[in-house]
């Protein structure tokens, strides 16, 4: 290819297995007409072999160590896709380094499949537009329900959480049925009231726990949209809820371990329920502990995190 002007290389994360973790980003040339759109955090379509893949611009560079004659140009920038925040790239980079995986092997599988599929040449409308239209927040059975009063032990735990500012890990230890969920909900209610655009993340270990909790949360917070993230959702529904979370339209996000890698730009608090549960450990593909990643995310974002359990793990205790 012809000489490329300085600053016109994109280092792109792609979901492909790699032999060497240090070589986890791939260099592509940026054509002048894409120079403004192809910024860090943007979504791009790139040539890969004889096909095309969706990738994420993780870095911009003035030069490349690859022979420029071998560097292929970006095929397109998906301009209706949300630009992902630097905080998310920081978390993904930690995960990739700590668990010895390629950056793209962590970043791309965390995104719903529908959104990381290259658009068909003659597609009518984008996957992002369809997903935005699809989002319907979790419905409440009894919208605006009155929270039950807390007992003394619950109130004491809540007071500790309410006093938390900045990063801190708080273990809520109580037997099953002791009312830990009520403490979470009272706390998150205060966080949402205090943070005008803040978002809260509530992780649960099993998919089966999400419907009832989502209904309960929606009833408690009728003014806020609730997004639900887990692997059993249909592709279009997962994409719709993920986009609502990423774009801040959903201020409450409930999910299983995959939600730990959701790029929430306005994260204000995290809850990990049943933090001891082995289901938080991803065993396929890029392996990680969602509980541990949630703690890292809270540290990086300087927000409080509550871990709840009747039988806490040794690490948390």
Regions found by a protein language model. Give the residues of each.
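Accessory, non-ATPase domains that flank or precede helicase/AAA+ motor cores in DNA-metabolism machines
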Residues: 1-317
């Amino acid at each position: 290819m012809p000489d490329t002007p300085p600053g016109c290389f994109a280092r792109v994360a792609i979901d492909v297995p790699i032999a060497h973790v240090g070589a986890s980003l791939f260099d592509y040339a940026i054509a002048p007409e894409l120079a403004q759109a192809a910024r860090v955090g943007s979504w791009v379509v790139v040539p890969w072999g004889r096909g095309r893949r969706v990738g994420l611009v993780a870095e911009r560079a003035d030069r490349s160590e690859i022979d420029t004659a071998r560097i292929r140009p970006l095929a397109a920038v998906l301009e209706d896709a949300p630009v992902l925040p630097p905080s998310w790239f920081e978390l993904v980079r930690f995960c990739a380094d700590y668990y010895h995986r390629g950056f793209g092997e962590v970043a791309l599988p965390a995104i719903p499949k529908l959104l990381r599929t290259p658009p068909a040449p003659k597609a009518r409308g984008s996957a992002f537009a369809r997903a935005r239209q699809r989002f319907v927040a979790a419905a409440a059975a009894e919208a605006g329900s009155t929270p039950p009063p807390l007992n003394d032990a619950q109130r004491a735990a809540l007071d500790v959480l309410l006093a938390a500012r900045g990063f801190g890990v708080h273990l809520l230890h109580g037997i099953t049925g002791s009312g830990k969920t009520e403490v979470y909900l009272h706390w998150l209610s205060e966080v949402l009231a205090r943070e005008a655009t803040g978002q809260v993340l509530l992780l649960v270990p099993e998919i089966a726990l999400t419907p009832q909790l989502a209904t309960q949360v929606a009833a408690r917070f009728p003014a806020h949209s609730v997004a639900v993230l887990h692997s059993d959702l249909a592709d279009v529904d997962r994409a719709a809820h993920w986009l609502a979370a990423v774009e801040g339209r959903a201020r409450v996000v409930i999910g299983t371990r995959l939600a730990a890698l959701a790029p929430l730009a306005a994260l204000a608090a995290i809850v990990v329920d049943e933090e001891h549960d082995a289901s938080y450990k991803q065993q396929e593909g890029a392996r990680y502990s969602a509980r541990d990643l949630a703690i890292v995310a809270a540290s990086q974002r300087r927000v409080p995190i509550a871990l709840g359990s009747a039988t806490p793990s040794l690490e948390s205790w």
